[in-house]
Curated annotation (Swiss-Prot):
It comes from Arabidopsis thaliana. Residues 132-148 have a biased composition (Low complexity). Its EC number is 3.6.4.13. This is Probable DEAD-box ATP-dependent RNA helicase 48. It catalyses: ATP + H2O = ADP + phosphate + H(+). It comes from the Eukaryota. The Q motif is unique to and characteristic of the DEAD box family of RNA helicases and controls ATP binding and hydrolysis. The gene is RH48. Residues 242-252 have a biased composition (Acidic residues).
């Protein structure tokens, strides 16, 4: 009976459990941790806690280190210089300094060599006192050949003076009353004097002890105190207490003697007699000729001739001034034979001036900050040291590494520049086996980058900061490979160390070993970048300026001109200037720089509608398109490239004949880099800056450059009609995007973005020039961020 009941009950329980198990969602569902966190949130939370714990431990170690340094400083300050190292070692108390010890330390500074220049008439007697101590002289003479023990001196003086004077029993190191002037001493009551204050007569410098003259000087001071007292009987000042007997007994002669004695002895409450001037410094009469020597023209010329730039050195070597090459050959330097073979196969035999000036420093393993003009071979100047560093590291490597190390890291600001440097590096490694060059740039799949780094050799890595930081933060194993880094190179250092990239670069530097060589290259190095470069370079780094002090940073063969025209006519002027240059130059190759990517797209569409052979590159285009167009423009002639600033730095487009910059660049350095796309490898070129009248202020930043203003050309009515027809065919969305981008760019420029009302008027004029009847509306959030909310002429989307 009971067995049947139990059997049925167990069957029902088993069925219900089976139903529950079968209804449960298995696999693929969210796994939650305590607090409703998924596994990624749980993982990040513990990683954050680990980082906080590590930072806390580092702070504790830093505090312990600073405490140890403070202890060492105190031990040095308290150590007795006369007793040697034994006394310093035995004195290991770490408490705070007493006021007396602090005063002694300050007084010791005024006894050092050269401190006489800081003395004044209140610091003590100029000459030694003639009044010596009669009594107690025997005891002092007995110790004249040994260091002075001032406490014995004071005790002996007190015994001999106790018959005539009554000394206060309590020791005072300072006075709480303001009865005397600066550098005067104070005592407890009236003419009472604390003899223990003579303890301050003892100098702390070892040079003072053991000399007979100093003993005589201190003997004379004791004699003055015994014969006259410190101040005689002085009259107390306001708010001080005195008796009538003291004031009646005081005479005029006593006043003067007491005052002079006070001036001689100085202040026992502050510095005592340690600042007594033993010898008077005689002021030499300086003539006007010594103060203002006449200028020697020959000396000035000789000094100027010593300041030689690389250009002057090349002239001494009888090289033509306009040549970028030096007389030195690559086979004269310490470069591997296989690399020399690759150079000779490429037809490169001589070094450029930049390579000649930097290669020896870089091959010696020194840090360097290099400034050189655009198109003078900077890439080769740091690729050759990178290859030699890799060869040296591979030959000296001990054992087998668990992971394949990366020995050289090169940072670039743009994807195109990274790809170009990688191509040059692969050409130099043509005959080297087992050495690979890889790139990490945006626009490619993350997993493909990881697979390529793991499967192919990579001793030299060329990367943009953003993508490299993504690999470091995603724990892809790249951090461990970078721990063997030997050489860190930053190309276009002024841009990468600017505020835009600096935070990413600092994070990357934190992941690199400190024992490394660092090289920074750029065509423009402002003072701010020179200061920030200390984050990357060592203190003893070399600064190599191949341009020269006071020399122009642009190429001499590049003709620079500027056209100031109304902003509404810029889209009419650019096609006119292009057609004029095409007619005059059969093998033309032109780059047109625009302020933003969407304005670039608008300009490209306009020129394409006008049947010109044109290509475009900007940040909004996919990476495959950018690479394809860049390679096509390098290999072709009779082509126009419309681009934004992604092509402004480092890109080596050969034989560019004209560079047009529409609108002001972001700064002076950007103008120089844009212009540097022409005139490369010592060839000629032309640069044209097209600005509006309200952008004329930018010319003040270029006043040291040979920029020639030229009048705006007269536009033909046929050209105007063609431009208007082509502009009307462009899609409205492209125009609206160009308007928004133009407004954002000039709002970020300090000079134009300061006055929002004027900026709105200029934006409306730009809007009408591109064929829009009214300006497109902004999102409310965008208008608030730009500070344009409530400005008339800026419509807000509801």
């Amino acid at each position: 009976m009971y067995s049947l009941i139990l059997r049925e009950r167990s069957g029902s329980i088993t069925g219900s459990l089976w139903n529950r198990i079968s209804s449960r969602n298995m696999g693929g569902g969210p796994r939650t941790f305590p607090g409703g966190l998924n596994k990624w949130q749980w993982k990040r939370m513990h990683e954050k806690k680990a980082r906080e714990k590590e930072n806390k431990l580092l702070d504790q170690e830093k505090q312990l280190y600073e405490a140890r340094i403070r202890t060492e400083i105190r031990a040095k300050m308290w150590g007795n210089p006369d007793s040697g190292e034994k006394t310093a070692k035995s004195k290991q108390s770490h408490g705070p300094m007493s006021p007396k010890e602090h005063i002694k330390t300050l007084a010791d500074r005024f006894m050092k060599a050269g401190a006489e220049d800081f003395w004044n008439e209140n610091d003590g007697p100029v000459k030694k006192s003639d009044q010596g101590s009669r009594s107690g002289s025997d005891s002092i003479d007995s110790t004249s050949n040994s260091p002075i023990d001032v406490r014995r001196l004071v005790s002996a003086t007190c015994d001999s003076m106790g018959k005539n004077r009554v000394f206060g029993s309590s020791r005072r190191g300072f006075s709480s009353m303001s009865r005397f002037k600066r550098n005067e001493s104070s005592c407890d009551e009236g003419d009472d004097f604390d003899a223990k204050k003579l303890d301050t007569l003892s100098p702390f410098s070892p040079k003072f002890a053991g000399t007979k003259e100093k003993v005589k000087s201190s003997r004379s001071v004791v004699g003055v105190i015994r014969n006259k007292g410190l101040f005689g009987r002085r009259k107390f000042r306001k708010n001080d207490s005195s008796t009538e007997e003291d004031s009646d007994e005081e005479g005029d002669e006593g006043k003067m003697i007491g005052w002079m004695d006070m001036r001689k002895t100085g202040s026992s409450a502050s510095l005592g007699n340690h600042d007594i001037k033993l010898t008077k410094r005689v002021n030499r009469n300086v003539t006007d000729e010594e103060l203002y020597p006449p200028l020697d023209i020959n000396t000035v010329r000789e000094d100027l001739s010593k300041r030689k730039s690389v250009d002057n050195v090349m002239e001494e070597k009888q090289e033509p001034h306009d040549s970028i090459y030096s007389a030195k050959r690559f086979d004269e330097s310490c470069i591997s034979p296989l690399t020399l073979k690759a150079l000779s196969a490429s037809g490169i035999l001589k070094m450029t001036r930049v390579q000649d000036a930097t290669l020896s420093e870089c091959l010696d393993g020194k840090d360097a900050l290099v400034k050189a003009k655009t198109g003078t071979g900077k890439s080769m100047a740091f690729l050759l040291p990178a290859i030699e560093t890799v060869l040296k590291a591979m030959n000296s490597g001990k054992g087998v590494n668990k992971v394949a190390p990366i020995f050289a890291l090169i940072l670039c600001p743009t994807r195109e520049l990274a790809s170009q440097i990688a191509a040059e590096g692969k050409a130099l490694l043509k005959f080297h086996d087992g050495i690979g060059v890889q790139t990490l740039i945006g626009g490619t799949r993350f997993k493909l980058d990881q697979q390529r780094l793991e499967s192919e050799p990579c001793q030299i890595l060329i990367a943009t900061p953003g993508r490299l930081l993504d690999h470091i933060e995603n724990k892809s194993g790249l951090t461990s490979r970078l721990m063997a880094l030997k050489l860190f190179i930053v190309d276009e250092a002024d841009l990468l160390l600017d505020l835009g990239f600096r935070r990413d670069v600092e994070k990357i530097i934190d992941c690199l070993p400190r024992q490394r060589q660092s090289l920074l290259f750029s065509a423009t190095i402002p003072k701010e970048v020179r200061r920030v470069s200390q984050l990357v370079l060592k203190r003893d780094h070399s600064y190599i300026d191949t341009i020269g002090l006071g020399c122009v940073e642009t190429h001499d063969k590049v003709r620079q001109s500027c056209i100031v025209a109304p902003h509404e006519s810029h889209f009419h002027l650019v096609p006119h200037l292009l057609k004029e240059h095409i007619n005059n130059t059969p093998d033309y190759k032109i780059i047109v720089f625009c302020s933003t990517g969407m304005v670039t797209s608008l300009m490209y569409t306009l020129l394409r509608e006008m049947k010109l052979n044109v290509r475009e590159i900007h940040a909004r285009k996919p990476q495959l398109h950018r690479t394809r167009v860049s390679d096509e423009f390098k290999e072709s002639n009779r082509l126009i490239l419309v681009t934004s600033d992604v092509s402004a730095r480092g890109m080596n487009y050969p034989d560019v004949t004209l560079v047009i910059q529409v609108g002001i660049p972001s700064d002076r350095e950007q103008y120089i880099h844009r212009l540097g796309r022409t005139g490369r490898e010592g060839k000629g070129g032309e640069g044209l800056l097209l600005i509006a009248p309200w952008e004329r202020y930018f010319l003040d930043e270029l006043k040291d450059l040979p920029l020639e203003p030229i009048p705006a050309p007269d536009l033909d009515s046929i050209v105007k009609h063609q431009v208007d027809q082509s502009m009307a065919k462009i899609d409205t969305s492209i125009k609206e995007a160009a308007y928004h981008a133009w407004l954002g760019y000039y709002n970020s420029v300090r000079e134009t973005g300061r006055d929002k009302t004027t900026l709105a008027e200029l934006a409306n004029r730009f809007c009408h020039s591109i064929g829009l009847e009214k300006p497109p509306a902004l999102f409310r959030r965008t208008a608030v961020k730009m500070g344009l909310k409530g400005i008339s002429g800026i419509p807000i989307r509801k």
